[in-house]
From Swiss-Prot:
It comes from Vibrio cholerae serotype O1 (strain ATCC 39315 / El Tor Inaba N16961). The keyword Zinc-finger does not apply. It is found in: Cytoplasm. Its main location: cytoplasm. One of its GO terms (biological process) is chaperone cofactor-dependent protein refolding. It is an enzyme of class 5 (isomerase). ATP binds at residues 30-33, 51, 87-91, 415, 479-481, 495. Signal peptide: none annotated. Belongs to the chaperonin (HSP60) family. It comes from the Bacteria. This is Chaperonin GroEL 1. It catalyses: ATP + H2O + a folded polypeptide = ADP + phosphate + an unfolded polypeptide. Together with its co-chaperonin GroES, plays an essential role in assisting protein folding. The GroEL-GroES system forms a nano-cage that allows encapsulation of the non-native substrate proteins and provides a physical environment optimized to promote and accelerate protein folding.
Length: 544
């Protein structure tokens, strides 16, 4: 076992604080509308330029192991804020740094660290309640666009495209961000339910221009098994032919004689038909077939529940206004399912999302909700160079998370104003003893730090602005982008309540642990073993 280096008390805390400050100083320059860029060196390729706090934090690893422990703990604050709300990482880092610096000064002055921590916790719990009271719902497209704009470092084009995407696919729709091919941002919206399975035979294609299968007002047959025998399909095919409507077959697979017969019938024009494989695998496939059944008002023909394909009738088939199938994807538009049944299914999947433990499962379940509830939007980020593209994609993803958080818990005045208003309401808060009161004051003073940093990054005088904002009321604050005082919500400077709340809670949690640290242990570097002595081959010259 390797030897350890152990440090105690003030000696340990000083080193830890140095690490905290190195990481926080690198991250906090990105805060606000006039936040600066940070350039990250990469082991290969061009350096990355970013204004995303968590991206900067993730890159930092310090040589001194005691300093590094402090830096890693603040990195944890940024990561937790990012996981919970998807944004607010820089605010969380700035708050953590302020609480740790003020808290450790009090510890050095002889205060009891445990009482300090209790005071900080008490102040944060009260501040969170005040933030909830200050929160206003974020319902309209304009407010959503404003939140997105602020989170994307005051880039209004990003805010507008996110608001447009949310308007088109609804609050539950899936919005993904991809790298585009053009210079401008683009928005692609897929309406209806799309799944990643294409036609089983190119002979089903009826739109030669686009190379796709287009079926208008089709019946949809859903089967939870492989179909290889055409006899099983005959009753359904005859019924569909009499109705003179097209048929889409979604099954585990259609092969051999069955596929060949369908192709021949389609080419001769006897019955317009197309077949695709069911999406997903295993239990997920069964669940997605059931989703399609509910969306289209059909039934999944499955032997598990006693239904046989030979006995299927037109009543068992789903229906839709249109189906479009390409080589890779199938899209069902305007299914004929009962709206109450669809809403019930969505509620059921939401419950599964609440109970899911893995991120992968949650993501897949969220996709299913979106496909049932509205659709999928893809924001394609455009830029002139790859470096700019990566930087912008980071900002768009941040803005997307921020708008989702805003819709969930509402918004408060941005620019650090909400924290100052919450702190001013708690001026009469007292703890159980004087040391807890110091802890409360540490937390309340730290809540000014985000505003001060935003002003500093904009090149203005932080103390003057902080005093002016503190003297104001309600949403009165400072717009660092224009240098104007006014109502922050009217100026469109909004922060999601969830982002501000999460930043404060996680910052206080980790800062409290650091203030109460009394010893730090790290591994000593291993000393290299001495080299083998030179054996020397002297006196052996003359050997042939």
């Amino acid at each position: 076992m390797a030897a350890k280096d152990v440090r105690f008390g003030n000696d340990a805390r000083v080193k830890m604080l140095e690490g905290v400050n190195i990481l926080a100083d690198a991250v906090k320059v990105t805060l606000g509308p006039k936040g600066r860029n940070v350039v990250l060196d990469k082991s290969f390729g061009a350096p990355t330029i970013t204004k995303d706090g968590v991206s900067v934090a993730r890159e930092i690893e310090l040589e001194d192991k005691f300093q590094n422990m402090g830096a890693q703990m603040v990195k944890e604050v940024a990561s937790q804020a990012n996981d919970a709300a998807g944004d607010g990482t820089t605010t969380a880092t700035v708050l953590a740094q302020a609480i740790v610096n003020e808290g450790l000064k009090a510890v050095a002055a002889g205060m009891n660290p445990m009482d300090l921590k209790r005071g900080i916790d008490k102040a944060v719990i009260a501040a969170v309640e005040e933030l909830k009271a200050l929160s206003v719902p974020c319902a309209d497209t304009k407010a959503i666009a404003q939140v997105g704009t602020i989170s994307a470092n005051s880039d209004s084009s990003v805010g507008n495209i996110i608001a447009e995407a949310m308007e088109k696919v609804g609050r539950d729709g899936v919005i993904t961000v991809e790298e585009g091919q053009a210079l401008q941002d683009e928005l692609d919206v897929v309406e209806g339910m799309q799944f990643d399975r294409g036609y089983l035979s190119p002979y089903f294609i009826n739109n030669q221009e686009s190379g796709s299968v287009e079926l208008d007002n089709p019946f949809i047959l859903l089967v939870d098994k492989k179909i290889s025998n055409i006899r099983e399909l005959l009753p359904v095919l005859e019924g569909v032919a009499k109705a003179s409507r097209p048929l889409l077959i979604v099954a585990e697979d259609v092969e051999g004689e069955a596929l060949a017969t369908l192709v021949v019938n389609n080419m001769r024009g006897i019955v317009k038909v197309a077949a695709v494989k069911a999406p997903g695998f295993g239990d997920r496939r069964k669940a997605m077939l059931q989703d399609i059944a509910i969306l289209t008002g059909g039934v999944v023909i499955s032997e598990e529940i006693g239904l046989e394909l030979e006995k299927a009738t037109l009543e068992d088939l789903g229906q839709a206004k249109r189906v479009s199938i390409t080589k890779e994807n199938s899209t069902i538009i305007d299914g004929a399912g009962d709206q109450a049944a669809i809403q019930g299914r969505v509620a059921q999947i939401r419950q599964q999302i609440e109970e899911a433990t893995s991120d992968y499962d949650k993501e897949k379940l969220q996709e299913r909700v979106a496909k049932l509830a509205g659709g999928v939007a893809v924001i394609k980020v455009g830029a002139a160079t790859e470096v700019e593209m990566k930087e912008k994609k980071d900002r768009v993803e941040d803005a997307l998370h921020a708008t989702r958080a805003a819709v969930e818990e509402g918004v408060v005045a941005g620019g650090g104003v909400a924290l100052i208003r919450a702190a001013s309401k708690l001026s009469s808060l007292v703890g159980d003893n004087e040391e807890q009161n110091v802890g409360i004051r540490v937390a309340l003073r730290a809540m000014e730090a985000p505003l001060r940093q935003i002003v500093k990054n904009a090149g203005d005088e932080e103390s003057v602005v902080a005093n002016n904002v503190r003297a104001g009321e309600g949403n009165y604050g400072y717009n660092a982008a224009t240098g104007v005082y006014g109502d922050m919500i009217e100026m469109g400077i909004l922060d999601p309540t969830k982002v501000t709340r999460s930043a404060l809670q996680f910052a206080a949690s980790v800062a409290g642990l650091m203030i109460t640290t009394e010893a730090m242990i790290t591994e000593l570097p291993k000393k290299d073993a001495p080299a083998m002595p030179d054996m020397g081959m002297g006196g052996m010259g003359g050997m042939m």
